[in-house]
Amino acid sequence: SLSIDVTSLPSISSSVYKNESFSTTSTISGKSIGRSEQYISPDAEAFNKYMLSKSPEDIGPSDSASNDPLTSFSIRSNAVKTNADAGVSMDSSAQSRPSSDIGYDQMDFSLNKGIKIDATVDSSISISTTSKKEKSKQENKNKYKKCYPKIEAESDSDDYVLDDSDSDDGKCKNCKYKKKYFALRLRMKQVAMQLIKDL
């Protein structure tokens, strides 16, 4: 559950105004709203100074004084005031709150069913870091390993060297370096066999 309480905000007051206030209570969509608002009339000099200090281009709809000449000015200058016994309830309808004659505008609300987080995650995910190309290469290597003959000096013959399976296009059978390759391959095999025996 998530609970938000703004009743501990500091009170900000202005010395220009007198403590004249009235409270209104209304019901919207079944939710009870209790407010104690402060519409205080400052003296005429303060309002005149405020209006005269602004250029005509800066005066907009927020500076309107059509209904109550000083309402917009007083609300904007009064900032935020908090009190524990006035507020807005968002959880229960027809909730009564005690009203106060003190000039406070306050809002506190709680969300009991607002946020629910389920932190359990089913970890049935298997991740393979081997790509398809790597898998196919490994399979091909395994196939070729099975086909290789034992390392013997006698295996150096036409059956194992430079046949169609060893060449890409099958054109190496008539290579002029074939005999030299046979001799070199036989010598390398003998060296490898000797190293294996020594180890």
Swiss-Prot record:
Q: How is it modified after translation?
A: O-glycosylated. Hyperphosphorylated on serine residues, when in dimeric form. Phosphorylation by host CK1 is required for the hyperphosphorylation of NSP5 dimer.
Which cofactor does the UniProt annotation name?
A: Mg(2+)
GO cellular component labels: host cell cytoplasm
Query: Which stretches of sequence are listed as region Disordered?
Result: 52-71, 85-105
Q: Where is this region: Interaction with VP1?
A: 1-48
* Any single GO BP term: viral genome replication
Keyword tags: Glycoprotein, Host cytoplasm, Magnesium, Metal-binding, Nucleotide-binding, Phosphoprotein, RNA-binding
Q: Name one Pfam family in it.
A: Rota_NS26
Regions of biased composition (Polar residues) lie at 90-99
Q: Which InterPro entries match?
A: Rotavirus_A/C_NSP5
Binding of Mg(2+) occurs at: D91
GO MF annotations for this entry?
Answer: ATP hydrolysis activity; magnesium ion binding; nucleotide binding; RNA binding
- Localization: Host cytoplasm
Residue(s) carrying Phosphoserine:
S66, S155, S157, S165, S167
What is the role of the protein in this entry? Plays an essential role in the viral genome replication. Participates, together with NSP2, in the formation of viral factories (viroplasms) which are large inclusions in the host cytoplasm where replication intermediates are assembled and viral RNA replication takes place. Orchestrates the recruitment of viroplasmic proteins such as capsid proteins to these factories.
The Swiss-Prot or TrEMBL record describes its family as follows:
Belongs to the rotavirus NSP5 family.
Quaternary structure (record): Homodimer. Interacts with VP1. Interacts with VP2. Interacts with NSP2; this interaction leads to up-regulation of NSP5 hyperphosphorylation and formation of virus factories. Interacts with NSP6.
Q: What is this protein called?
A: Non-structural protein 5
Protein's organism: Rotavirus A (strain RVA/Human/Japan/KUN/1980/G2P1B[4]) (RV-A)
Lineage at the top is: Viruses, Riboviria, Orthornavirae, Duplornaviricota, Resentoviricetes
